[in-house]
């Protein structure tokens, strides 16, 4: 009995020392940013940037942007936001999606592009961490040659380690409700991260992270469901004919991804499908198709962001360490990466069993990860419905449709939305604020 008591006391002391150590030594740097090049005047919110080292020798330096809630940071939730890719910078979220800044869409004239405030930032209702991950994305870098390339499951562990160290330094947020969010390819990483945090709360880590749930937009979840939904989606959106759709169904048997080379009929009709859809904007089918970043094209803002993020005055203001990376790119698709999660459905199941809330939303004009695939894998969970399919409204207008399930999962569409939420920022912001407050959409 006595030895057990002594062991318990020693263990508690070690955990306390470990927590203090994390808070004092494991954050590589953190700086409050009062102003940014390209933005006129002081920033109307509190921005912090910094690096946190993860790994045995803290060889991986993850860069982050932290923005306090513009409402009540002492009590509002804390949301970690992960961009997709894998390899896309968190500037995608900060400047194009749900952050408080955006690129001013002027034609580039050789001077520094301008930034403007946004009206529908999710920081109106929560504090947010925008994280550059995996290593090589955005401004994150490695101090040494990595023995193992990043992976889906490995990123979940690194993100968990990042959060432990970040909260060790920002203990005033340790009791705030915590959520993980993301879109696109992060549909593979976010559910695994939630499970990793949950596991850590039970097994190893003190203090526990106050994890409440997660939010995902147009998430890649299961290659079979998501890829095979593209052809039914194209038919429903009048991108292909009835005859071609029926021929595809008959010859491919519903599997358009793993077609046997000898199934020449199926391959022939898939080629016809591609001819019909190759010049469609994948991100939102009603937008112009653009092969280059021209001023009249939506992706022109990506070019402006590259000019902005590669400017030396911007890097100095953000406290980017010199000579850690070369040219900043919005999405570094060439990162060596191990795609070791083929389906995140089991993670969704485990997270629901553990009682975590989830909001899964889809822009209904996204061709990259169509809402049909998302609906299909959600149905495969066999959750009972507690609030059946209905429109959700903003100012007496239909903003989308929603359904709520017994396991605290809410699915919603955003009418007219695309692959990411910047196409419908007001609708997305109102949807998020209602959900995060526990209100029905």
Curated annotation (Swiss-Prot):
UniProt xrefs under Gene3D superfamilies: alpha/beta hydrolase
Main location: secreted
The entry's keywords: Carboxypeptidase, Disulfide bond, Glycoprotein, Hydrolase, Protease, Secreted, Signal
Documented EC number(s): 3.4.16.-
Compartmental location: Secreted
Cystines in this chain: 88-331, 252-266, 290-297
Residues listed as glycosylation sites in the UniProt record: 109, 350, 382
Chain ranges passing through the membrane: none
Position of the signal peptide: 1-30
Expression sites by tissue: Expressed in roots.
Enzyme type, top EC level: hydrolase
Active site annotation, chain numbering: 184, 366, 419
Pfam families from the UniProt entry: Peptidase_S10
GO molecular function terms noted in the UniProt entry: serine-type carboxypeptidase activity
Entry's Gene Ontology BP terms: proteolysis
InterPro entries found in the cross-reference section: AB_hydrolase_fold, Peptidase_S10
GO cellular component: extracellular region
Known function: Probable carboxypeptidase.
Assigned protein family: Belongs to the peptidase S10 family.
Name this protein carries in UniProt: Serine carboxypeptidase-like 3
Originating species: Arabidopsis thaliana (Mouse-ear cress)
Classification lineage: Eukaryota, Viridiplantae, Streptophyta, Embryophyta, Tracheophyta
Gene name of the record: SCPL3
């Amino acid at each position: 009995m006595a030895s057990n008591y002594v062991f318990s006391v020693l263990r508690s002391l070690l955990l306390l020392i470990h927590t203090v150590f994390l808070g004092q030594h494991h954050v590589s740097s953190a700086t409050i940013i009062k102003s940014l090049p390209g933005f006129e005047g002081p920033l109307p919110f509190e921005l912090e940037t910094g690096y946190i080292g993860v790994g045995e020798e803290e060889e991986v330096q993850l860069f982050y942007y932290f923005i306090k809630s513009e409402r009540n940071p002492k009590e509002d939730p804390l949301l970690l936001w992960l961009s997709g890719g894998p390899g896309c910078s968190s500037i995608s979220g900060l400047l194009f999606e749900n952050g408080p800044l955006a690129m001013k869409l002027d034609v580039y004239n050789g001077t520094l592009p301008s930034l403007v405030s946004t009206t529908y930032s999710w920081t109106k209702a929560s504090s947010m961490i925008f994280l550059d991950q995996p290593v090589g994305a955005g401004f994150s870098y490695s101090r040494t040659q990595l023995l193992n390339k990043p992976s889906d499951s490995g990123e979940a562990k690194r993100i968990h380690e990042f959060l432990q160290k970040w909260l060790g330094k920002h203990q005033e947020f340790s009791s705030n409700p915590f959520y993980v969010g993301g879109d696109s390819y992060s549909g593979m990483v976010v559910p695994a991260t939630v499970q990793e945090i949950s596991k850590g709360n039970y097994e190893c880590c003190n203090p526990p992270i106050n994890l409440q749930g997660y939010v995902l937009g147009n998430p890649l979840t299961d290659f079979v469901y998501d890829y095979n939904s593209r052809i039914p989606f194209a038919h429903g959106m009048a991108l292909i004919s009835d005859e071609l759709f029926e021929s595809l169904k008959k010859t491919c048997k519903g599997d358009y991804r793993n077609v046997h080379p000898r199934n020449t009929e199926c391959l022939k009709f898939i080629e016809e499908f591609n001819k019909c859809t190759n010049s469609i904007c994948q991100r939102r089918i009603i937008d112009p198709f653009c092969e280059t970043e021209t001023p009249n094209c939506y992706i022109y803002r990506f070019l402006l962001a590259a000019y902005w993020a590669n400017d030396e005055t911007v890097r100095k203001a953000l406290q980017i360490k010199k000579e850690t990376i070369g040219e900043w790119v919005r999405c570094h698709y060439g990162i060596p990466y191990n795609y070791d999660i083929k389906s995140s459905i089991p993670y969704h199941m485990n997270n629901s069993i553990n009682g975590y809330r989830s909001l899964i939303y889809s822009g209904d004009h996204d061709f990259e990860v169509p809402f049909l695939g998302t609906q299909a894998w959600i149905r495969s969970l066999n959750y009972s419905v507690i609030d059946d399919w209905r429109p959700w409204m903003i100012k007496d207008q239909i903003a989308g449709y929603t359904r709520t399930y017994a396991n605290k999962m809410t699915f919603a569409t955003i009418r007219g939305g695309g692959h990411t939420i910047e196409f419908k920022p007001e609708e997305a912001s109102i949807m998020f604020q209602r959900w995060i407050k526990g209100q029905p959409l």
